[in-house]
UniProtKB/Swiss-Prot annotation:
Its main location: membrane. It holds the Pfam family MFS_1. The keyword Cell membrane does not apply. It comes from Oryza sativa subsp. indica. It is a multi-pass membrane protein. This is SPX domain-containing membrane protein OsI_32082. CDD domains: SPX-MFS_plant. The keyword Transmembrane applies. GO terms for molecular function: transmembrane transporter activity.
Amino acid sequence: MVNFSNKLTKDQIPGWEEYYFNYKMLKGRVNEYTEQTKEGTQYRRRVLKDFSKLLDDEIEKIVLFMIEQQGLIAARLEDLGKRRARLQDIPLLQEITELREDYRSVGLDLVTLLKFVELNANAVRKILKKFDERLGYKFTDYYVRSRSNHPYSQLQQVFRHVGIGAVVGALSRNLSDLEERQGSYLNIYDQHPLAIPKDPIIDLITATADKLTNSTNFLRFLGQHALIAQADSTAGTEDEQHVGEDKYHLMSLVLNLANTFLYMVNTYIVVPTADGYATSLGAAATACGAVIGSMAVAQVFSSVYFSAWSNRSYFRPLLFSSVVLLLGNVMYAMAFDLGSLTILLLGRVLCGMGSARAVNRRYISDCVPPRIRMQASAAFVSASALGMACGPALAGLLQTNFSLYGLTINQITLPGWIMAFGWLVYLIWLWISFQEPDLGPDAKDFYEGSSSSTSTRYMEQEKMEQGFTEHLLPSEQDEEDDNGDEEHNETLSSSTTTLRPASSVASAYTLLTPSVKVQLLIYFMLKYAMEILLAESSVVTGYYFGWDIGTVSVFLAVLGLSVLPVNAIVGTYISNMFEDRQILVASEMALLAGVMLSFKLTVEYTAAQYVCSAVLTFVSAEVVEGVNLSLLSRVMSARLSRGTYNGGLLSTEAGTVARVVADGTITAAGLLAGEGRLLNATLLPALLVCVASIAATLSTYNSLFY
């Protein structure tokens, strides 16, 4: 494995050597400090002070050089602008071509500067990690906290690279103007960003900047929300890109998205009528928690076997999912005429056993080419959100009551019959149109954790995932390069083993850092709060306000429809103004306020109080979910980005367990406290979990560095 010091020297840009981070010198200082502290000749505070000063000097050198180079690029753009102005009246084709090439040359210089920043950022992160490991200090937390949050922060100058955006804008505008001299009187500010003609150099700059730090536009925000592994757009060889194109089949992708949509509709279509169904079978209205939650109980187990099954096939698990969901919905609908609560619950359990969301995620991650994977990830999240909104809305429309061949068709049973018909149509469509991708034996072995696989393709992907997106804090991926500093003869076989996906729950758990554990706790908290709100909505609103099924359905549909606009606002605007960790804490506080506002503390409980608190709780939970999964996709080990026990499965399991616990809480509280005390009895655990998650977030705040 290549020694990082040698790699740093090898990758340096000729003429810029003196401005690079002096990793070799600082590594030597760390070794000196280690020996001195062992001998007792150096005090801890003195070591921290000396090393902080050395780091500050090195980072200042990098920042000042970066600003100097940005100034030179800006001066060149100004000169080119004057040349372009002279061509306005007398456009000469040859001079326009030369000017366009000069603009592209500036763009290439900007790419070079971005690579300079990336290499230095990696060096800073690695020396911080090495310092903590050798001396046993938590110096990284102190350094990041004290430097990144300071108003004169030089770290932020590197991480935010605000001037880069201005240069890209100037290049885009001028290249677009030179390219479109005829037939158009619009400039880039009059057009939608997606409609602007892009020069290849702009795409190269964007790809390099995205590798340096994750961009926070709406599309990427939704993609991270799905927690689907994203490949670097510049990563991989042409052969690898060709393999991705060979696997890709548009109709198969649409079928996976349709499966996601239908499953979310299936989950929430019963919420407005679950209490009425329970009472019609002789149970308490609060048994709606058991009716709704039984599907989540089964999903806890189905997510694991579907994730494992997708190692070998995509068609067969989707086929099995469709059949099981078809049968489950038929049982759900027939339970009314059979007068059996057991049949009702078994039907919902069968529906939960058909949850193929792990397969849908995996298909997008493995079989969709990198060029459109982010769009597919965003479509996955959008399909889930629309399904969540359409479920209750559809239930509100099914207001009828008649018999057909001895079967009762009413607002309680129709959700089951409608979904059974939907899954039957989907099953036929799947059988006719789905195309099974060729996984190949090497991919199967690798994803299943087989020791026989020595594929280097995934090693290269792991290397590309290393870098500035991890920022300064240590991660599992750093072990490779750090070991390279000490052992130069590490073999390819051991390297592949290090990069192999987790092969069991136990091995996946060992990869969970404190930051990842807190992120999963936050995910549990927000899903718990949302499930409490949604699952008991029909009981609470019926008891306090006398709402009918139609009103509850509209209320839940409006909440569901808020998902995409909220994500759009956060992903497009708010995340560009604040750090993700700041948004996370603020939205958790807002969620806590929503839960507190929901309590019935006075004699009169108004619909206005309930609606306002519900909207605040739900919207805050959506913001928390998006930002939390965005952060989770950065801080989790690369080994959790693929395989059976991947990050998507872990987050799904955390959310599903939260739903099970929440539905169980509703049922238990209804039996023990009755409908009159149900609201406060279920909100109290949600309040405690929310407080615990905020405390955990603050305790790991510095590990969530953006």
